[in-house]
Amino acid sequence: KVRKMFQELFRDDGGDLQVRQKKIEAFLEQSHQLNNQYENGVFRYKDDFHSVTGYLFLYDPDHNYIYKASHVWRFADCIEFYDDFGMGDHVKLKTYYRMCDELVKAMKADAALMATDSSRFENGWGVDPATFHPDTEKHILAFDIIYCSSTYNLFKGITYVRPKTKERQLMQEKKEKAQELLANLQRAQEQ
């Protein structure tokens, strides 16, 4: 049963994030069922959205990102990415991947950061660089930045706002309204 769950999770989805979202949700549902059946609801093992995105990331880091809420929310606030990710095991994968894709795009444009990243392949600590994943898509680096920024308080000295839930909702509504108005304007200009 567990092997089949992982096979389904790792099945190619062609990059369709809606399909991937459904695969994650199905995996979590089956995992919760097994936990209730064999462990009577005692959670000895990680059984959440973070752990499942971790499995996907370890399986294929070039096409997946790890989601760790405590680190992601703080990072998103710092870069003023206020779109709604959802909560708990109901994370909106498409929104989270959009933020990560924007981060990767900015990282790839920074020559100094790319030079520093490529220096990790220089064998100075007794590890064969050929054993490293090349991280051509920079998804590993993206999570390193998100995780380390929060873990090591690299936000120190940066002024940023951590909006409350209602403020976030209002920002999201304003953004959606602005996008709607822009689309209406573009349609009107085409006529």
Name each model feature, range by range.
Residues V52-L56:
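Cytochrome P450 catalytic-core helices
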